[in-house]
Amino acid sequence: MNYELDSELGFSRETIATCLERDGLLSVELEFTKKCNLRCIYCYSEAGEGLEQELSLREIVSVIEQARDLGAKKIVLLGGGEPFLFPDILEVIRHIYALGLSQAVFTNGMLLTEELCRFLFAHRVQVAIKHNSVHPAVQDALAGVAGAHRGIQRGLRLLMEAGYPGEGRPLCIQSVVCRQNRDEIEPMWIWAREHGITPYFEELTIQGRARQHAQLALPPEEIRAIFERLSRIDRERFGLRWDPRPPIAGFTCRRHLYSCLVNSQGFVQPCTGIELPIGNIREQPLGAILRESKIIRDLRGIYRQIDASCRVCQHAGECYGCRGNAYQATGDYLAADPACWLRQGTRATVCH
């Protein structure tokens, strides 16, 4: 089984090609608020307190409907902080469900209740829950809050008791691969697979709070070794085949061919890592913002536009590394990903 082609994490190459031909969308990522009940030391958005003039329910619904009209099939509820701190999150989920769109929510799990988990299951919401470590001290340190491990484990248990993963409702555990948890990655991966849970394990991008904790990041050679071991485990134990490449184990990022992000103040940007606003949905329709953006055009044509050293790589046309990592490390979203081990001659890391 080719895991990437069958995984619920992405879209098929054929679907992406059709999206590019019609210059549309397949998904949109939404941030609701910067408010968060954790203070993760690697948080890309430095979430904590909410911002002024964050999007209203009406504005969020409008973005979702505009995305649907542009061809989006999936809405990814990132939160920006913790999505379940947004007071109207249940109305957002109901609306997406009524439109017949797929939806996924990324949560730290701390606010989950039995009732909420049943609601998510009933509305066919895919859930990705934070899960960086099985050790309380490590998880709490990474989350920046005492007791985080206990709350996360409780949330995971409640999701599984509600029926996840099952009946077309995938459950993911999300982890950043870093120095503190590198020895836990393989056992957590195996545990997830054995329970039908999708492991969403990604390398660290040095942005936000992670800039103050750059020692968290592992060198590319070590990330490569970890990903290769995970690939071998999947092949030998679970019959799943995928090629190890950054930035996510078992999954190649292709979101820049079909997606964008709208943050909690309405600014549109390519992804969480490329913090370059290309417009604001309070001033222009989403479709117009995307059509008029050179940045989006560059990224839709990434395999032609990317740094020359990547275009001659044997993996050119299949992989573009992490564009967010490239931008955060170099200031150029078309630069080679300095954490990529596939590109010949790459020895630099994002930990200068």
What function would you assign to each model-found segment?
Residues 1-9, 55, 69, 99-102, ...:
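Radical SAM enzyme [4Fe-4S]-AdoMet core and its adjacent flexible, acidic
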Residues 2-19, 24, 46, 273-352:
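Flexible mid-to-C-terminal extensions adjoining Fe-S/redox cofactors in radical SAM and related proteins
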Residues 2-126, 218-219:
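Conserved alpha-helical substructure of the radical SAM core
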Residues 30, 34-37, 247, 265, ...:
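Processing junctions and N-termini across compartments
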Residues 60, 223, 286-289:
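Hydrophobic/aromatic residues in well-formed alpha-helices
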Residues 83-84, 112-113, 136, 207-209, ...:
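Short secondary-structure capping/turn micro-motifs that flank functional sites
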